[in-house]
């Protein structure tokens, strides 16, 4: 029987290759959600994912869902929407509101993995410059957005939401264009699903993903990309 690794006060994680196959990708439990631990985890392709009644669980799935920016799919109808929409898009204007909205979204599984502890941890990570948000506005009303972590020249997407049709897709479109400005090559989507696949997300063997991540982490992202502002249409 394989025993699950328990984290201690150090920032040490076991190698992702030691993750379980059942449940797939579960690597360790315990530890905390400090800024240093979160950044250390993401730099190694590891992320927390757990429910309110569970200990902190750490994952590194195989295969990994990634979105190569050159593979991002924009349908004709979405392009038309982007050209004509009155919706505005901003970066890092309302991170707190975005993560709270994502936590309220009803998922296929019961409950939410964005617990109060997770919310507080990622808000602190945002304040330290390690997590960022894209917001979509209808006049002054927040109608969509997404957030994620940047452990290097890669964006690790965490969650998205929308109250208006195509609002989350609009946020993704602007995110992709923003990342391209910094020479970023892919978004870490963690796990593949039908919605992400429709946008161009593919599955990649974990070992290959970790090699690409290792290179991306060597090159910090230009923080000027994340200055709070309204984004103009590319």
From Swiss-Prot:
Domain of life, per lineage: Bacteria
Pfam families recorded: Leu_Phe_trans
Catalytic activity: N-terminal L-lysyl-[protein] + L-leucyl-tRNA(Leu) = N-terminal L-leucyl-L-lysyl-[protein] + tRNA(Leu) + H(+); N-terminal L-arginyl-[protein] + L-leucyl-tRNA(Leu) = N-terminal L-leucyl-L-arginyl-[protein] + tRNA(Leu) + H(+); L-phenylalanyl-tRNA(Phe) + an N-terminal L-alpha-aminoacyl-[protein] = an N-terminal L-phenylalanyl-L-alpha-aminoacyl-[protein] + tRNA(Phe)
GO molecular-function terms, A-Z: leucyl-tRNA--protein transferase activity
Gene Ontology BP, a term: protein catabolic process
Entry keyword Ribosomal protein: no
Protein EC: 2.3.2.6
Gene Ontology annotations for the cellular component aspect, listed alphabetically: cytoplasm
Compartment(s): Cytoplasm
Major localization class: cytoplasm
Gene3D superfamilies: Leucyl/phenylalanyl-tRNA-protein transferase, C-terminal domain (3.40.630.70), Leucyl/phenylalanyl-tRNA-protein transferase, N-terminal domain (3.30.70.3550)
Record SUPFAM superfamilies: Acyl-CoA N-acyltransferases (Nat) (SSF55729)
Keyword entries, A-Z: Acyltransferase, Cytoplasm, Transferase
Function: Functions in the N-end rule pathway of protein degradation where it conjugates Leu, Phe and, less efficiently, Met from aminoacyl-tRNAs to the N-termini of proteins containing an N-terminal arginine or lysine.
Assigned protein family: Belongs to the L/F-transferase family.
Name of this chain's protein: Leucyl/phenylalanyl-tRNA--protein transferase
Lineage of the species this protein comes from: Bacteria, Pseudomonadati, Pseudomonadota, Gammaproteobacteria, Alteromonadales
Protein's gene: aat
